[in-house]
Design a protein with these regions (language model features):
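Noncatalytic regulatory segments and standalone regulatory/sensor domains
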Residues: 24-28, 33-37, 155-217
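Active-site-adjacent structural segments surrounding the nucleophilic cysteine of cysteine proteases
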Residues: 18-92, 140, 207-208, 213-216
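Sec-dependent N-terminal signal peptides of Gram-positive bacterial secreted proteins and lipoproteins
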Residues: 2-21
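Solvent-exposed loop/turn segments at secondary-structure junctions
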Residues: 55, 67, 74-76, 90-93, ...
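Stable alpha-helical elements in mature extracytoplasmic
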Residues: 56, 61-68, 79, 83, ...
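Active-site-adjacent substructure of cysteine-protease-like catalytic cores
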Residues: 113-164, 168
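Mid-length scaffold segments of soluble, non-membrane domains
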Residues: 78, 83-119, 129
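Hydrophobic side chains in beta-strands
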Residues: 15, 138, 154, 194-195
Length: 217
């Protein structure tokens, strides 16, 4: 009985610690970037095998690339349809959106280095606090019925993630997410792409991007 009681007590302590951690106050962080909704881009960008290709239908990856580039280069930021057009020119479109390698190559075209990685909560937080946005490839679940891209863009005071979802304004502006939730939503062995631009100081990028966001308001 003592052993059973000890197990119950340990479980209760762990649950209490988990709840306390969930409520802990942390330094909030926001990486200011343009927030694009792919449904605002319904016009055909190019034709693939006699079918019109639009950002609205298959451009979540292009929208995420545009948001990341807009964060680093606020004065020279492409829009999602510009990115999708470039994908077509480079032959990166394969009929059902853009693959992970395509996103990495598109970022490279804009001078941003993307590296797909497996990440735990601490690695995600450390990366964001360095000023590097993270593109995540999510599988079937909360965000999508199949495959989808979102951008991790900040941390709230209560230790949750801010996410830019190009498929949903509500999930972008009105929702926050536990680290464990986003890790669980990731699809594949390496679902997180760290985005860096070495020749642009992070502080400068954040300041200029914030100024541009303020002007848009």
């Amino acid at each position: 009985m003592k052993g059973v009681f000890a197990l119950i007590l340990t479980a209760a302590l762990l649950l209490g610690a988990s709840a306390a951690a969930e409520k802990r106050k942390v330094e909030p962080l926001l990486l200011p970037m343009p927030l694009y909704n792919q449904h605002d881009y319904a016009e055909p960008v190019f034709t693939w095998h006699e079918r019109d290709v639009t950002v609205e239908e298959s451009g979540c990856g292009a929208a995420c690339v545009a948001m990341v580039v807009g964060y680093f280069e606020p004065d020279d930021a492409p829009e999602p349809d510009d990115v999708m057009s470039l994908a077509g020119e480079l032959g990166l479109y394969r009929g059902d959106g853009l693959g992970r390698d395509a996103l990495r190559l598109l970022l490279d075209e804009y001078g941003v280095e993307g590296r797909w990685r497996k990440m735990d909560a601490q690695a995600i937080e450390n990366t964001l606090r360095k000023g590097y946005p993270i593109v995540e490839y999510v599988g079937a679940g909360y965000f999508t019925e199949n495959g989808h891209y979102v951008v991790l863009r900040g941390i709230t005071e209560d230790g949750k993630l801010l996410v830019a979802d190009p498929n949903s304004e509500e999930k972008t502006t009105q929702k926050t997410y536990r680290f464990a939730t986003m890790i669980q939503q990731g699809k594949g062995d390496y679902p997180f792409m760290i985005c860096e631009k070495e020749d642009v100081p992070v502080e400068t990028a954040q300041k200029e991007s914030a100024q541009r966001s303020a002007k848009r308001k």
